[in-house]
């Protein structure tokens, strides 16, 4: 029996807060207005309905022709901010803003944060460890939390997440612009009928009698489609209910997201993402075979190697000495496979990965018939991001001096920020996409693209330029 080709990716983020006015005033001050949601909107366990806020498609998903003809705010942002020394050496990231919609601009900075976070995780791992994260889920969760942050705590988060860079890029941008764009991004990504399944749940659980501000609850609902629900964290029934909810969303792939909770926990944020996509160019099951995969200079393992032939976009980066292949999913999502030519080249590639580099790859790609060999793999990763985020400069959020007065009048300390994610890549899922050549040599002499050594992968949604998932496969034979 033949099955449609697909890839499964999912991510779960948990943030727990244990026991520390102004959001309404802030929103009023910045003249922020949002459309009201249908009464039953939040009863959906995924944000996949077809509700379209008035005017949003016209404002944030513009074609380049519209950008050039209607609004110079989308064209000359680079002139508004001078690049720093570090950015000058690698190319000012704000230059990527030209010709981009506001949502694409926000996602460029979300990707910059994701690559920095990835590097911290990489430094904590060994070279033989696989890595997998869902950047869109992490950024969304941090955006939600930042609604209630004040003072230096708010500044730290906005600086590390590069939200501050976004606001400084244009006089027309404000802090509340970011939350509005996350709202629109969530709506765009999780609508139906794009040829793939992408589902998300944002749940906010609050210990009974814990005084969460009503304006914070309302803002969570409006901007991030997150419902605040009462919970008794000491009650095993709560864990069972939460796990059942996540089990249903992830189609059984994450069975016990919550093993136990501290009775002192007062707030928990769950962000869960599930993705299932069909490859544009399918991998015939009968072509899968055992193949050598080089772990390092000394070790080789046998893996199940998928094989197909078709038109694929690819490029070669001589500076980073790597090859790039784009595998396209049905519906406007693609996976970039990035493989160093030398086994020793992964460190350099990881150190220099930036949004500028990715855009140059995409612009240098050429389309031709290629034979592709890609190993099947499944990754399951579970991270507590507290120490990771601390090392990146977010410290006050996780200590008693943090200012979360926009969430509660009582002091709150976040002691757990859990990120759990799973990806399954097999014959039932793959993809590819295109652009023009700028400064890179195309893979003109190579007709076979063989992924037989450690590689990186990046999963993007094209219309929003959103980095959904990324990771490193050092050994396809283990999770």
Swiss-Prot record:
Sequence repeats lie at residues 55-65, 69-79. Glycans are attached at residues 31, 168, 367, 403. Residues 1-23 form the signal peptide. InterPro entries: HCII_serpin_dom, Serpin_CS, Serpin_dom, Serpin_fam, Serpin_sf, Serpin_sf_1, Serpin_sf_2. Residues 55-79 are annotated as: 2 X 11 AA approximate repeats, Asp/Glu-rich (acidic) (hirudin-like). Different composition of the N-linked oligosaccharides appears to yield a 68-kDa and a 72-kDa form. The record marks 443-444 as: Reactive bond. It comes from the Eukaryota. The modification Sulfotyrosine is found at residues 61, 74. Residues 172-192 are annotated as: Glycosaminoglycan-binding site. GO terms for biological process: blood coagulation. One of its GO terms (molecular function) is serine-type endopeptidase inhibitor activity. Keywords: Blood coagulation, Glycoprotein, Hemostasis, Heparin-binding, Protease inhibitor, Repeat, Serine protease inhibitor, Signal, Sulfation. One of its GO terms (cellular component) is extracellular space. It holds the Pfam family Serpin. The N-terminal acidic repeat region mediates, in part, the glycosaminoglycan-accelerated thrombin inhibition. Belongs to the serpin family. Thrombin inhibitor activated by the glycosaminoglycans, heparin or dermatan sulfate. In the presence of the latter, HC-II becomes the predominant thrombin inhibitor in place of antithrombin III (AT). This is Heparin cofactor 2. It comes from Rattus norvegicus. The lineage of its organism: Eukaryota, Metazoa, Chordata, Craniata, Vertebrata.
């Amino acid at each position: 029996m033949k099955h449609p080709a697909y890839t499964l990716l999912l991510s779960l983020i948990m943030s727990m807060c244990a026991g520390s006015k102004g959001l309404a005033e802030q929103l009023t001050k910045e003249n922020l207005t949002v459309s009201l949601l249908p009464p039953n909107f939040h009863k959906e366990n995924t944000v996949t309905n077809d509700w379209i806020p008035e005017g949003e498609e016209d404002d944030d998903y513009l074609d380049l022709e519209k950008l050039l003809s209607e609004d110079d705010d989308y064209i000359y942002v680079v002139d508004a901010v001078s690049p720093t020394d570090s950015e000058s050496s690698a190319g000012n990231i704000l230059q990527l803003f030209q010709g981009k919609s506001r949502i694409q601009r926000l996602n460029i900075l979300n990707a910059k944060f994701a690559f920095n976070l990835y590097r911290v995780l990489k430094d904590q791992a060994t070279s033989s460890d696989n890595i997998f994260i869902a950047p869109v889920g992490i950024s969304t969760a941090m955006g939600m939390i930042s609604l209630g942050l004040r003072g230096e705590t708010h500044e730290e988060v906005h600086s590390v997440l590069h939200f501050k860079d976004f606001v400084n890029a244009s006089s027309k941008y404000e802090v509340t612009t970011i939350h509005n764009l996350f709202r629109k991004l969530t709506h765009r990504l999780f609508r139906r009928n794009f040829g793939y399944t992408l589902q998300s749940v944002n749940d906010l659980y609050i210990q009974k009698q814990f005084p969460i501000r009503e304006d914070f609850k309302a803002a969570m609902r409006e901007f991030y489609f997150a419902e605040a629900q009462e919970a008794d964290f000491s009650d095993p029934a709560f864990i069972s209910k939460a796990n059942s909810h996540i089990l249903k969303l992830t189609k059984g792939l994450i069975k016990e997201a919550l093993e136990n909770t501290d009775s002192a926990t007062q707030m928990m944020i769950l962000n869960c993402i599930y993705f299932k996509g069909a490859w544009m160019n399918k991998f015939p099951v009968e072509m899968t075979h055992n193949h050598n995969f080089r772990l390092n200079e000394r070790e080789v393992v046998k893996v199940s190697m998928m094989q197909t032939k078709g038109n694929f976009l690819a490029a070669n980066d001589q500076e980073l000495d790597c090859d790039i292949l784009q595998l396209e999913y049905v519906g406007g999502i693609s996976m970039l496979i990035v493989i160093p030519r030398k086994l020793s080249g992964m460190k350099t590639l990881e150190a220099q990965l930036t949004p500028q580099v990715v855009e140059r790859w995409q612009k240098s790609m050429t389309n031709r018939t290629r034979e592709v060999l890609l190993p099947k793999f499944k990754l399951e990763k579970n991270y507590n991001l507290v120490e990771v985020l601390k090392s990146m400069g977010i410290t006050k959020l996780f200590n008693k001096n943090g200012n979360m007065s926009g969430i509660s009048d009582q002091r709150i300390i976040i002691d757990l920020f859990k990120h759990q994610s799973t990806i399954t890549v097999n014959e039932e899922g793959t993809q590819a996409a295109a652009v023009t050549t700028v400064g890179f040599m195309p893979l003109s002499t190579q007709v076979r693209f063989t992924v037989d050594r450690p590689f990186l992968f990046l999963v993007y949604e094209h219309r929003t330029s959103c980095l959904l998932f990324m990771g490193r496969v050092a050994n396809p034979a283990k999770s």
